Swiss-Prot record:
It holds the Pfam family DUF179. One of its GO terms (cellular component) is cytosol. This is UPF0301 protein CTL0463. SUPFAM superfamilies: VC0467-like (SSF143456).
Amino acid sequence: MTKLPYALLDKGSLLVASPDVNGGIFSRSVVLLCEHSPNGSFGLILNKILEIDSPEEIFPLDHFDESKVRFCMGGPLQANQIMLLHTSPDSANSSIEICPSVFLGGDFSFAGEKEGRTRDDKMLLCFGYSGWQGGQLEKEFLEGLWFLAPSSQEIIFTDAPERMWSDVLQHLGGRFASLSTIPENLLLN
């Protein structure tokens, strides 16, 4: 995996928080950039997992393998809004493809489709989103608060989201790989 240059800041890129982003929701975050334009940007944090006591009250899991449905904190904005990231090509007409085989949006109706079998689709239900005003993300990027990496379905829907930050940095290689080993609490070093 190679680091993407700043000019490739675009939909489908991963924003990887620098270790300098210390504290708060963006500390060690990996954000999937879902939209980027001169007017602003928005993305979803992928690796801040939420434990939900009764997920069936939020989303019908009847036809899904629960191990393939994850809940996460998408960002600090509108935390009561749910954004759906998924791999279901069945809902491609009502969704936006963010990167190959990863879709954003659509309604939950595809959950009831193909009754009688367990679906293999993977899903992230993200509470809230992350947003930047025009020029803000570029400024943060130039200040070294974010690194840019390519995304893939495998990274987005990893079975180990708690390791996503360090795994992506490891794959970037070089100095990024060494950054992945910095402990979260430097006092424990």
